[in-house]
């Protein structure tokens, strides 16, 4: 029993190593996504634009930002939409969808619900009431 406790290793998370050039490319990809929320980039486009192998890009991005590129991009856009819904209540949902690159408001509503748990209309109503103190 004593020997078993002596051989137990601390299980520390091993962080992968990435080259500086890879990290710069991943930061560039992040800036591309956050700077252009109206555009839905495919991973193939990003890989080509930043000249980084697809597998390396996907793994590195997830290790750095904690989510896949697709999920990060979607969550980022829906958080922007949530802010827009509450900041400008006169702006129509279709207009917000269009600002974020969605041509179909139904697809936007579906994406919004999958991230926020409420439709854009419900979100605006419920969160707006909380902010207004009602």
Predicted segments with their positions:
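Extended amphipathic alpha-helical coiled-coil/heptad-repeat regions
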Residues: 116, 121, 125-129
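Terminal helix-turn-helix DNA-binding modules in bacterial transcription factors
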Residues: 27-35, 40-45, 63-103, 126-134
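Conserved mid-sequence domains
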Residues: 36, 53-58
């Amino acid at each position: 029993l004593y020997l078993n406790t002596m051989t137990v290793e601390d299980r520390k998370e091993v962080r992968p190593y990435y080259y500086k050039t890879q990290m710069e490319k991943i930061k560039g990809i992040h800036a591309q996504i956050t700077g252009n929320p109206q555009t839905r980039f495919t991973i193939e486009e990003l890989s080509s634009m930043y000249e980084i192998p697809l597998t390396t890009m996907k793994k590195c991005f997830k290790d750095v930002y904690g989510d896949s590129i697709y999920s990060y991009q979607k969550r980022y856009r829906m958080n922007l939409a949530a802010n827009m819904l509450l900041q400008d209540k006169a702006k129509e949902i279709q207009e917000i969808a269009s600002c974020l690159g969605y041509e179909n408001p139904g697809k936007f509503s579906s994406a919004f619900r999958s991230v926020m748990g409420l439709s854009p209309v419900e979100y605006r109503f419920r969160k707006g009431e909380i902010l207004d103190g009602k």
